[in-house]
UniProtKB/Swiss-Prot annotation:
Positions annotated to bind ATP: 528
Chemical reaction(s) catalysed: tRNA(Val) + L-valine + ATP = L-valyl-tRNA(Val) + AMP + diphosphate
Pfam families: Anticodon_1, tRNA-synt_1, Val_tRNA-synt_C
Protein name: Valine--tRNA ligase
Quaternary structure note: Monomer.
The species this protein was found in: Shouchella clausii (strain KSM-K16) (Alkalihalobacillus clausii)
Class of the enzyme per the UniProt entry, highest EC level: ligase
Function: Catalyzes the attachment of valine to tRNA(Val). As ValRS can inadvertently accommodate and process structurally similar amino acids such as threonine, to avoid such errors, it has a 'posttransfer' editing activity that hydrolyzes mischarged Thr-tRNA(Val) in a tRNA-dependent manner.
Length: 880
């Protein structure tokens, strides 16, 4: 697009953002080209669930990736940022079932096929919604390559992996204790269980010996499971019970006889040293049961109610059963103590239901061999996955070293149906990518795979694998970086690494960049229950996407949590306005000035040379920091350069040339200003894409879009050390003069005398070169610069680097009047200090006032004391 030299008075994000995102998509600027002359760079987006709105965490995650994608694209890489979404088995099915319930329909009323049709309708609706939200944030993904975890290509990959692992003996079907969600009636993997501290009880009871010779004491937090007890275990070396090993006890209520067994697992020091063994309802008891060939008595149904094995409790909810059993045990006088007990209880991550350890036949991945192979990648620099920050590598390694087999079957309809069939007559199992040829004689397993099974294949399945000749797979895999939160290192990162190693022979990504969680201003995790969540759309509507993005990018360091403050988003909005106004000023002084007129090699002023040098330093720093994933620091460097160097200093100094009569100086400054703004907008673009595109299109420029403009490169020929030294001297001098004017209430419009004593002739020459700037910024009536300058009487003095500054007070202000004003101010400050000291010496106040109020008073005391000291010193100077 051609530049337009007039800009609106105010920046309007709502109009600008939609315009430019549409323009970018139409121009296909985000699409990877496969250009063999360019080096590939790839990222796959962590696929959001098709269950609803994206939250601030998604916006943060996406902003970080977009900074990388936009930067690399501008640096000339063939950049692929591949988008997609996750089918999110349990979560989506629960949402669809909930929607059906509102219409009085259950999934069973519809049947599997019709229910899946409804689920796909849900997916299509929410996928569109997610794309709209991505557009609002401004992310530069390649929509032409968008994938979904249930699309055909990914389904083929899932089948390939399942069948391969099964044939290698790494997927098996067996009866084990699994985590069971009675609400959704499905198995859960260990990392889908959230542990919460719950106030419960220890129930101490005695099981009578069958021979009537006594009893043995046991304790449990789940008395309802005693109905499934098949033994009592003691430690073989526990002298208290050695004479009882092999004897039988009679199970209260049930009346079933069960043995007392010896097992090393039992902790002699815990409780009575004897434990009830329920192999069908506890994972440790299950292992003990296997060692001792104990029967497995399952006493619950899948919905958490008691089954026929529970006898008279059949049909009762498990927790109601617990209450009734306690009453019945008390009636039998075998329950002799109930002890309060705070313990950690597993809850379903999705439904919130208390998870039940449950005996069930499920499909599992044998994890130990896969984990060991994945960990070998970390042994060599050219194969390892680099974690940023590095400390998270240990989180990953610890998880993999202590990993348990992964339960991958889920009792759902929405998901990848397990590619296993059972012969209707022989019950033979067939596992394959295609159904058996005589499919009428077989029934397919009704369960689906854990959502994370397909997500674990995301980096390579999205690139066309298992076709290893697929162009995208050959060019863009392995990917360069994965950006994700520390909370899913175990859930997702570890699984992608072991599947990547198992099926592609290499790491799925070179780096893993870990960020934290977004919290509210008080440091609390955002949640529905606290009502402290913030919708990114609300932020964008109020301040624009760029303000939100810049806040998210600069608000934290890698691996750490980010606190959300509306005030900080507002400050980034102010930053955007500062950039806008600076650009408007520049364009107002560029009438008739085009891109071809830019010439930064002509004679330049000190300010021109200084800002070009600062630009090179900023280019070097920002590029290095982005490469190191230090986006916060990169943003702060840009902020300081734009706000302080460009806006507060250079633009003000540029006015000397722009408003002057020297046409050559005017053209040089125009060139430098245009160049600096162009290069600055390019560096800022990955952080704030919309406003930078809008400004860049108005500036003299070349090319269709800043999105594909070249990234700035450090240029040593534009570094002017002498100009930097000149400017540092001038800035410190001007700052000291402005500070003195402010302290003495002398307005800038009032001319004052300035006397400067440089320490040597070199500094004197430096100041003489900058006289025009001193006169503009200091407004002197007299400017005297001399190495042999005599110290004037009655003058404010400042010892600066390489010089002394004197501001004669005569003519600058009425000394007597100023002293009187300061003494009046001192009197007020003395009274305030006295009032606060009296309050802080009052024991009643200290005892009753909240601690934060006391701290506020102490802070005021220090503030007033510091102000008082400054006024005392100022009075002394004026009287001297």
């Amino acid at each position: 697009m051609e530049e337009q030299h007039s800009m609106p008075t105010k920046y309007d994000p709502s109009a600008t953002e939609k315009k430019w995102y549409t323009y970018w998509l139409k121009g296909k600027f985000f699409e990877a080209t496969g250009d063999p002359d360019k080096q590939p760079y790839s990222i796959v987006i962590p696929p959001p669930n098709v269950t609803g709105k994206l939250h601030l965490g998604h916006a943060w995650d996406a902003t970080i990736q977009d900074i990388l994608a936009r930067t690399k694209r501008m640096q000339g890489y063939d950049t692929l940022w591949l988008p997609g979404m996750d089918h999110a088995g349990i979560a989506t099915q629960a949402k669809v079932e909930g929607k059906l319930r509102e219409q009085g329909i259950s999934k069973y009323d519809l049947g599997r096929e019709a229910f899946l049709e409804k689920s796909w309708e849900w997916k299509d609706e929410y996928a569109k919604f997610i794309r709209e939200q991505w557009a609002k944030v401004g992310i530069s993904v390649d929509y032409s390559r968008e994938r979904f975890t249930l699309d055909q290509g990914l389904s083929d990959a899932v089948k390939e992996v399942f069948v391969s692992l099964y044939n290698k003996g790494l997927i098996y079907r067996g009866e084990y204790i699994i985590n069971w969600d009675p609400q959704t009636k499905t198995a859960l993997s260990d990392i889908e269980v959230i542990y919460k501290d719950v106030q419960g009880a220890f129930y101490h009871m005695s099981y009578p010996l069958s021979d009537g010779s006594g009893s043995i004491e046991i304790a449990t937090t789940r008395p309802e499971t005693m109905l499934g007890d098949t033994a009592v275990a003691v430690h073989p070396d526990d002298e208290r019970y050695q004479h009882l090993i092999g004897k039988m006890v009679k199970l209260p209520i049930v009346g079933r006889e069960i043995p007392i067994i010896a097992d090393d697992y039992v902790d002699r020091e815990f409780g009575s040293g004897a434990v009830k063994i329920t192999p069908a309802h506890d994972p440790n008891d299950f292992e003990i049961g296997n060692r001792h060939n104990l029967p497995r008595v399952l006493v619950m149904n899948e919905d958490g109610t008691m089954n026929e094995k529970a006898g008279k409790y059949e049909g009762m909810d498990r927790f109601e059963c617990r209450k009734q059993i306690v009453k019945d045990l008390q009636a039998q006088q075998v329950l002799f103590k109930i002890e309060d007990h705070l313990h950690s209880v597993g809850h379903s991550e999705r439904s919130g239901a208390v998870v039940e350890p449950y005996l069930s036949t499920q499909w599992f991945v044998k994890m130990r061999p896969l984990a060991e192979e994945a960990l070998k990648l970390q042994e060599y620099a050219d194969t390892k996955v680099t974690f940023v920050p590095q400390r998270f590598e240990q989180t990953y390694i610890r998880w993999m070293e202590n990993i348990r087999d992964w339960c991958i079957s889920r009792q759902l309809w929405w998901g990848h149906q397990i590619p296993a069939w059972y012969h209707k007559e022989t019950n033979e199992i067939y596992v394959g990518k295609e159904p058996p040829r005589d499919s009428e004689n077989w029934r397919q397993d009704e369960d689906v795979l854990d959502t994370w099974f397909s997500s674990a294949l995301w980096p390579f399945s999205t690139m066309g694998w298992p076709d290893e000749e697929a162009p995208d797979y050959k060019r863009y895999y392995p990917t360069n970086v994965l950006v994700t939160g520390y909370d899913i290192i175990a859930f997702w990162v570890s699984r992608m690494i072991f599947q990547g190693k198992a099926f592609t022979g290499q790491r799925p990504f070179k780096d893993v960049l870990i960020h934290g969680l977004i919290r509210d201003a008080e440091g609390r995790k955002m949640s529905k229950s606290l009502g402290n969540g913030v919708d990114p759309q609300e932020v964008i509507d109020k301040y624009g996407a760029d303000s939100l993005r810049f806040f998210l990018a600069t608000g934290s360091t890698p691996g750490n949590d980010l606190r959300f403050y509306w005030e900080k988003v507002e400050s980034t909005w102010n930053f955007g306005n500062k950039i806008w106004n600076a650009s408007r000023f520049a364009l107002m002084n560029m009438d008739g000035f085009s891109y071809s007129d830019i010439d930064i090699n002509q004679e330049k002023s000190i300010a021109d040379k200084w800002i070009l040098t600062r630009l090179q330093e900023t280019v070097e720093s920002v590029t290095r920091l982005i490469d190191a994933y230090e986006f916060g620091e990169a943003g702060r460097v840009l902020y300081s350069f734009i706000w302080d160097d460009v806006c507060d200093w250079y633009i003000e100094m540029a006015k000397l040339a722009l408003y002057g009569e020297n046409e050559q100086a005017k053209q040089a400054t125009r060139s430098v200003l245009a160049h600096v703004l162009d290069q600055t907008m390019r560096m800022l673009h990955p952080f704030m894409p919309f406003i930078t595109e809008e400004i860049w299109q108005h500036l003299p420029h070349e090319g269709e879009s800043i999105t594909v403009a070249n990234w700035p490169v450090y240029d040593q020929s534009l570094v002017f050390e002498e100009a930097v030294e000149d400017m540092e001297a001038l800035k410190s001098l001007i700052h000291a003069i402005r500070t003195t004017r402010s302290e003495l209430n002398v307005p800038m419009s009032k001319q004052i005398e300035l006397k400067i004593r440089p320490q040597d002739e070199q500094m004197a020459a430096r100041l003489q070169r900058g006289v025009a700037y001193i006169e503009k910024f200091a407004n002197p009536s007299l400017l005297d610069i001399a190495v042999d300058l005599a110290t004037p009487e009655k003058a404010m003095s400042h010892a600066l680097s390489g010089m002394e500054l004197f501001l004669p007070l005569a003519g600058m202000l009425d000394l007597d009047k100023e002293v009187a004003r300061l003494e009046k101010e001192l009197d007020k400050l003395n009274k305030e200090v006295e009032r606060i000291e009296k309050k802080l010496n009052n024991q009643g106040f200290l005892a009753k006032a909240p601690s934060h109020v006391v701290e506020e008073e102490k802070a005021k005391q220090q503030d007033y004391a510091a102000k008082r000291q400054t006024v005392i010193e100022r009075i002394a100077e004026l009287k001297a």
